[in-house]
């Protein structure tokens, strides 16, 4: 059995993170010492690592709750359910990547249009393009 600080250290999170997951009903603490300290098991450590890894992959708390539910009661769930949750997250990531690539292209056009000299920025193409909403990036300074 582990106290909250020990569990936090092993899972590389803070005790406040564990308390937060408890409030979100993603972690439970059924055992306490006579002094009122929470005690956790190896199973709690595995659950906490599961949650932490899912958070690192960007899953929402709701998705993690669903995945935990599937993990806790695998006999009443299918792999298709887990895969559906992962596919949804994958689509979100792909959309974000496309958005970032579009942003990168826009920034590259702004960068390429500017001569970057030490002259006054009175006629800076970057500033002009940003003012116009980047609708027409002109070359020059």
UniProtKB/Swiss-Prot annotation:
Keywords: DNA-binding, Metal-binding, Transcription, Transcription regulation, Zinc. Residues 1-70 form the HTH merR-type domain. One of its GO terms (biological process) is DNA-templated transcription. PROSITE patterns: HTH_MERR_1 (PS00552), HTH_MERR_2 (PS50937). Zn(2+) binds at residues 114-115, 119, 124. GO terms for molecular function: cis-regulatory region sequence-specific DNA binding; DNA-binding transcription activator activity; DNA-binding transcription factor activity; zinc ion binding. Residues 4-23 bind DNA. The keyword Transport does not apply. It comes from the Bacteria. SUPFAM superfamilies: Putative DNA-binding domain. InterPro entries: DNA-bd_dom_put_sf, MerR-type_HTH_dom, MerR_fam, ZntR. The keyword Zinc applies. Zinc-responsive transcriptional regulator of zntA. Homodimer. This is HTH-type transcriptional regulator ZntR.
């Amino acid at each position: 059995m582990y106290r909250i600080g020990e569990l936090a250290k092993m899972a590389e999170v803070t005790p406040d993170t564990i308390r937060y997951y408890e409030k979100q009903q993603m972690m439970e603490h059924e055992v306490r010492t006579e002094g009122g300290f929470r005690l956790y098991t190896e199973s709690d450590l595995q659950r906490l690592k599961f949650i932490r890894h899912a958070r690192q992959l960007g899953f929402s708390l709701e998705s993690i709750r669903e995945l935990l539910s599937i993990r806790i009661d695998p006999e009443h769930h299918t792999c298709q359910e887990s895969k559906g949750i992962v596919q949804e997250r994958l689509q979100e990531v792909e959309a974000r990547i496309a958005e970032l690539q579009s942003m990168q292209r826009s920034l590259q056009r702004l960068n390429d249009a500017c001569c970057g000299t030490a002259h006054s920025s009175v006629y800076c193409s970057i500033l002009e393009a940003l003012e116009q909403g980047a609708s027409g990036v002109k070359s020059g300074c």
